């Protein structure tokens, strides 16, 4: 086989197919997995997954698509970088990261967000393909990058991922190459942009945010329109005039774009097909802010007058007739709100004119208002909004805007008029006319013919342009409206003529009637004319707006003679009335006269950079023509409209500087020119004209040429400054200071031009003048006059703006010195805010970038900063703080960009002067302060720029050691606070990591100082070291460094860029600890928690380095005290909080054990103690990890189990506070599940820690949530009330009564609160009534086995008994159980599995129903207890359970299966009784017994007898019960046709053969016979009841059953003897209700005791019993009150036919319970006592009860069973003990008249006892004997 070889180029690839590895060495791949390839061999690669480097293996080459990479080597480590463009890589990484979140959103059912992320991912995938294609034009690529980065940033924000900071080109900023301040500002900017983007997304107003943001930020815009097609049935040629239209103002706002369309449906010029492109330019922000903008198209037909005329030859052709309009609202496209894509086609519907005389303009308004149907006719266009003017868009969009693209300019100037943009366009709009028909019978069809004529009447060729894209023409023919007296054309054309011709030209308008027939039309001549000159006599142009012209009539030939009409008036006189007279006009010359009937109006708009409409401005521009008016014109300039001035900015400035240059020898006009210049500069500073800054800049650099102007400008400026300094009035000085920047620009440019012209001549003189000028400024700053305050503020604001220019012609160092003096001459506390703002501008200038300048300026700046920052922080100084931090930011930013060699001293200056000041500002500033993040960034930047030598130098600047300690303490506290409460938003990952890197270095540097200065015993500073350790641990445990919690992409990003900083600081902590020496003991146990927190970080190397510190701590304490209890206590306390908080794992537990045990090798004396400690901690960790593992689990059962495990641990280790904490957690879990009984038992454990005393509670035994102090009695009483409420909800009234009695004793005997006692006794009575009247369902019990290694340790291979909820079936329980473990497999057998299943890796669950086993106790033995009471104990307070299954053995008799039916019975013993603090407990013992067929028969017979007896009792108690169940039961036993009863037992067991083969079963056979014999009296009693209740129609059935019974009775009594029950006659009379008894007087226990042999006495006195004695089920309480010693009547209870349940009641030692005078345990003993009592003590403080407590820890707390005290049935000998035990159950008053009958009943029970078999017989309790 060929050897594996290292790959060279094949380094990086992506899986394009799924690869499922079949061998161990194969690497399984999924589509999209990125792999790093290391080696290759044939068709195989070897490598690993990028996202999981531990997943290594081989995989086929054919499954991998290779990617180009570049390999970078850093410190012998190869860094492989994909060769794709960075943005494509970023998209790939983003898609990976979003992909996993996208799946999580699906699982979490967050549909809306899921679909949103999916849509964004699809967008990114598509854009990534476009990026990788490499085919996009430059402008589209740029736009796509913006879209991609915007989408990524937005997606990251809504998915709560880290913010990505970028440069201006969208590339991710590298923190290593970016200063801290730049990084901070980049984060701020990115956050702002994303916040704005989210606002836009939420408002849904701005879907294309990228376009919107660019459009809104640019001053000039253009709209690109591409006409794709025009669909319209015309039949003649047409002209399409497209323009932009403002519907509110009803004005066209752009030039027309003219498309000439042919009659055959194509452009007139076929080469224009697919090339009809236009750009509407010069659109400004004002246009974007219009309410609405429409794209309109006016269609003019060229042809016949009437399109319907058939005879085309006779018709006049070439007429321009209205045809229709097309309109589209493009407001959203213009504003960037709607999609703007050059590929998307828009349809603009066409609307024709409804009549021949409809005006197009009017139709436009109707269409906009109505939006009628177009019938499918219209324009198809594509549009795109472009940013920039025509020059810019030609560069940025060359594929759209080329030489063939038509440019349609705006009607009017753009918002910025650039120099060189020479324009002389005059727009003429034909508005309307009113023409009289005179001699014609109908109104005229008027056509206007416009031309541009010279003063001699000649037509100027090509002077008129109808629309952009069309050739210029000599004359323009208007649209003809048919027979309209007042036509409204509203047609706009452009007149473009050379400027030099403007003075001699005029516009001439001819009016002609056009006839429909060609023959008539030829004879038509011009019937009138108008004219207008474009220039006025004063040299200004025609003013913009409306003009009503004179209409001249006369000879048509004379109309073409300029000399004939130019002498006539052009405008109608304002007062001239159109309808005055029809008489001949007084104005007539040479055959032409003014018509008084006809009217014609136009409007004009002049867009000229050379022609002005202002006389004053014109006078200045042409000052040479009238020099005598120069002073006047200069003064008038200030009142000229600003718009007019800026329009002619270049010409105006040229004029001003020409005046200055031509009067260089005189200063006559210097101040006037200077003031005029200041006025112009002031105009441009105005917000309205701020865009003209670029124009002024361009003028200064390209057009300005006054070489001597600097001298005059400096002279005037100095004069103004000096005048103001003296406090004298100088009106222009404030405007001058505001214009200082441009004044200096002119000065510097002028000096530069002079220097170039004369090769540096007069440089010394210039510098001296400049110096004196600055000295004048400084003098102004020193001035104390009130009038100068405002000037000083202005100087501070505007002086920095001149530096950029001044330093080009002036020595920088000298300039810095002048600036130094400028700031120092201002009094210290004066204008501080303005000084700082001014300094900030200085710092941002080029001057500050020079080292020698910084040397001069930095000290004055730091001094000012220090003074301001150290002022008291209140609202007044808030603004100063803001400016201070901005200034400091600027300084640090400048220094970060310089070479370190040139900034060393400057960093040192800032460090010494400002570091501590900034630190203290951060410390005192609130964390919610708006500026806190800015100051922290500043502080971080200072530390970042400090070198090692800076640190050393700074430490030495402290004069005393206490001052140094204070500084270090301040710094440590500040660092810790900033780490704990990050001042940056959570998604500022890069900023946080840079801060951490800087802090880490600073901490280590300061640690070196501590080692050097504060380690020795005499100089040891405990608090300083303590602060250091706490800071270091806070640093290492901060969330932003826990790499394991991050996504794979983020993990790699941080690791590659910053490394794992936790290791570095962790190793430092270790080293610092070991350097402490004898001082270590000071930090025990204080540092145990922090060190524990550090060791729990899941980084193996860090753990190995830091866990030994624990051993060192133990050793240190051990050597001092002989033990390490403090350490141990602290570890246990802190471990709980840490693990619950998510820290710690199995690996930690193992590592802790192995490392600590290794450490003991060298210290054998402590080895055993350490071993015990490790065992303890390991046990706690296991339980805590189990608990944490199920905290988020849906299964509350598992959480409860783990909580109980922790309860036991804390109880065993005497941790009261933690014990109580988990008690309440368990209580809350139970309440969530409505397990009220279990919640009550849980809370009861807390009460056992409390005494009935007025002692104040210690904090550790306080109830969770109780903050105010309480006494033991108050807390215990409160808890009892809560517990009683829980027991009531859980229907555990027996337990509730027990607690009520204990409370009653306190109320009666201790606090004597009879009111509370009354309420308590009422409550008890209610509970007793509930026991007797309310049905309580018996819960089922289920055995559950968890087998297999897949289960957690607290379940693995264990069996539990679960107590089911009310009416919960096994199937439901099992389904719910399996839902908690979806991967578990259900076992179908009930036998215990083998080791193969137990050791299997999976999960196997076994679940089956078990029967509770009732424990016998003397309390109920041989006593007449009602079913309501005894049934409760059958399924409560049980600890033993069994499960039975039949098995066949021996020979099977098909006729009698009982003979061979054995029972295999599995018995379970739980750790504690149920119910308890859990609904389940672990099985601690299992045993299996086999029950013979004879024993099974005995059990079966016992069950049947019990069932008969129970049913008799029910029917005695409730006469309303239906008779059917009793009928079926009795008939099934007595009828031979049905009966299979004991006959099958006789056949199987009562044979000589059986007796011979089983001599050991004689007693059992006797027992069975005895049970058969006892069945007869029970059946007899049942039949007697049946006889009384049977209906007539069932009487034959009863008779038959009675006959069968007689036969059966005869047979049984003959063979097994006679048994008779006492007869209950006449017992109702005079008996209290509570003493009434039915046949059910013999409980299950007493029945089980009747295992007598045949020698049982056969007769008892008949008068002892009365079958009629049972009372009704629910008699009214008011009628028969309950006596204290009585029981309540029984309720109707149905018995399950499927199973027999036994009950059990366990008692405390009765004799011990009487010892009421014994002392209570101490608090500590009480807590140490076992919470897992096997018996429940109602008064836990008594020694008699406590003596039964097990002090050895068990695995789970027990559920205390009912004690004698709880039941309230003490023996008669207890009557004189505590009041709580003073009441007896069967106490009868001496006056009872029926005492004799009671004795007879007891005599019957005594007889029953005597009949027991010898092995079952037990000693009769004393109290029973006494009673008898």
From Swiss-Prot:
Tissue distribution of the protein: Specifically expressed in hematopoietic cells.
SUPFAM superfamilies: ARM repeat, SH3-domain
C2 DOCK-type domain mapped to chain residues: 423-607
Membrane topology: Peripheral membrane protein
S-S bridge residues: none
Region feature Disordered, mapped onto this chain: 1652-1703
GO terms for biological process, alphabetical: actin cytoskeleton organization; alpha-beta T cell activation; alpha-beta T cell proliferation; chemotaxis; cytoskeleton organization; establishment of T cell polarity; immunological synapse formation; macropinocytosis
Record-linked InterPro entries: ARM-type_fold, C2_DOCK-type_domain, C2_domain_sf, DHR2_DOCK2, DOCK, DOCK_C_lobe_A, DOCK_C_lobe_C, DOCK_N
An example molecular function term from Gene Ontology annotations: guanyl-nucleotide exchange factor activity
Residues modified as Phosphoserine: 588, 593, 1683, 1704, 1729, 1782
GO cellular component annotations of the record: cytoplasm; cytoskeleton; endomembrane system; membrane
Cellular localisation: Endomembrane system; Cytoplasm, Cytoskeleton
Record's keyword terms, sorted: Acetylation, Cytoplasm, Cytoskeleton, Guanine-nucleotide releasing factor, Membrane, Phosphoprotein, SH3 domain
Chain's role: Involved in cytoskeletal rearrangements required for lymphocyte migration in response of chemokines. Activates RAC1 and RAC2, but not CDC42, by functioning as a guanine nucleotide exchange factor (GEF), which exchanges bound GDP for free GTP. May also participate in IL2 transcriptional activation via the activation of RAC2.
Assembly behavior: Homodimer. Interacts with RAC1 and RAC2. Interacts with CRKL and VAV. Interacts with CD3Z.
Protein name: Dedicator of cytokinesis protein 2
Organism for this UniProt entry: Mus musculus (Mouse)
